[in-house]
Amino acid sequence: INTVVTTDAPLGVHLSAGDSGTSWGTLDRPDALLRAGERLKSAGATAIAVVARFPDDQESEALAAYRHGRGVDALAGAEAVISHLLVRHLRIPCAHAPALEALPPDTELDPRAAGEELGYTFLACVLVGLSRAPDLLDLSSGCSIACTDLIADQLGAVVVPDGALGGEAVLASLERGVPVIA
């Protein structure tokens, strides 16, 4: 980690859920996020880990269901908005860790949610993932492709978790006729 930047304004994260049960979110100030990302890239960042304050709603039914293995992550949609916005704008890998108040201990906690109960953010997980993130290639700029690079034309199929079919990479694969296995 070579540079830490704070946004010049609160992002104003809002969480929502669609009728299908998928989570999504919006930002009041995406411009503040993009300016902070630009400062990091100018300082030499090759990947960005974002920690943003998220709304706390410890009494929500969605949170209780998720903690007990019966629901979707209500934060994931807004996290994706943050990460995808920066990746699309800066063309470098980015991942997000929400900052939340600690939740009270739950003896019925589902093991799949246990890792998310260990701290106020999930930054350690994000940093491990980003340390293994691939470089993004802009083929329209005429960059050279190494024999170890993976590009869309080389994909025979894409395997994704059931219910995770709305992401940009999956939709782009479908547009190219690449089979998607869920």
Model-derived regions: residue spans:
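Anaerobic metallocofactor- and corrinoid-dependent redox/one-carbon enzyme cores
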Residues: 1-182
